[in-house]
Amino acid sequence: MTANTSRSTVLTGIGTLVTNDPTVGEGPLGLIRDAAVVFDGGVVAWVGSADSAPAGDVGHDLDGRAVLPGFVESHSHLVFGGERAEEFAARMAGQPYAAGGIRNTIEATRNATDEQLQANTRRLLDESLRSGSTTVECKTGYGQTVAHELRSTRIAASLTDEVTLLAAHVPPPEYAGRADDYVAMVCSEMIDACAPQAKWIDVFCETGAFDRDQAHAVLTAGMAKGLIPRVHGNQLREGPGVQLAVELGAASVDHVCYTTQADIDALAQSSTVATLLPGADFSTRNKYPDARALLDAGVTVALGADCNPGTSYTTSLPFCIAIAVRDMHMTPDEAIWAATAGGARALQRADVGVLRPGARADVLALDAPSYLHLAYRPGVPLVSDVWRGGELAWSAHTGHEKARALR
């Protein structure tokens, strides 16, 4: 225990503990059976067999439940106004997805008050917490003027440390046919204004959004201001997004539904994470990424929910885990790792997505004896308790909830 006045917590009665640390447990997930976890001062102090657990000031007997690191959501778009349920219904009736739908959200976001945007973002973060996400990245991208993007970055930064400037989402309506002019504005006054509130710079490198040269300009302008690059790429067809991400050393390239062997090889030889977003492919009836080919080649894979009002209005990583196992041919172990340690890799974080001494005490317990149930029982709300920074943030059994700023 640490020599301070904090109260230590010990979780006992853990049926299966996922640590994601193979040095302390079995296999890549570092599994420990009949386990215990101790946290103190907001960090993990000890993990191991329950019969060797040190005493804590506060104890919780989990009665055989499985325990995992909190999910790490590395891709979300939570600052927006309105919704697009009618667009979803039309798409399900056979109309193809087009990026133009984003422009409907741009209008609704611009028309929303600060209070409305803040409340909606909090609501979605609360929802994410209830499904087990304890670290959430949040993108802008629905304001697309300097003032509106600055407002979005400020709202996001008030709620999470993982803020991404996605000003280059699609060219806004007032820049129709003038994407280069919009890019020039993003690369100058918009990044200048928003960079102090953000950590990441992102771009949608896709036909109908921004081409390779435009995406390169946005990313390098952000990098010049200290932002770390991420890329939306290869979602709708093969394209330059993957190769651009690797070239610039991006933390991740997200979607990657359409890849060549050269794309897969480039990712395998790089540190760029491939973040797969099955919720978007489910909701648009798009082709799922070839996760098996990526994993077999040695690519680091993360899973994200991609919560947004147009193409993936879900905050549930358990739902995405089930899809990844059923339709993307990932094993349950691979999907769990991708939603925890993989998301942490995509955010370049070593303190989350893992349960080992010194890691942040972000922990979730399931109403199930094994983590396998997350894929085995799709659609069932299995997350029973969530601790964030060592504090009980939500419990299905008590209704206890403290889902606020993700600090």
UniProtKB/Swiss-Prot annotation:
Binding-site residues, Fe(3+): H75, H77, H232, D306
UniProt keyword terms in alphabetical order: Cytoplasm, Histidine metabolism, Hydrolase, Iron, Metal-binding, Zinc
GO biological process assignments: L-histidine catabolic process to glutamate and formamide; L-histidine catabolic process to glutamate and formate
Annotated Gene Ontology cellular component terms: cytoplasm
Domain of life (superkingdom): Bacteria
This protein's record includes keyword Acyltransferase: no
Known function: Catalyzes the hydrolytic cleavage of the carbon-nitrogen bond in imidazolone-5-propanoate to yield N-formimidoyl-L-glutamate. It is the third step in the universal histidine degradation pathway.
NCBIfam families (UniProt xref): hutI
Official protein name in the record: Imidazolonepropionase
Species, as recorded: Rhodococcus jostii (strain RHA1)
Organism phylogeny: Bacteria, Bacillati, Actinomycetota, Actinomycetes, Mycobacteriales
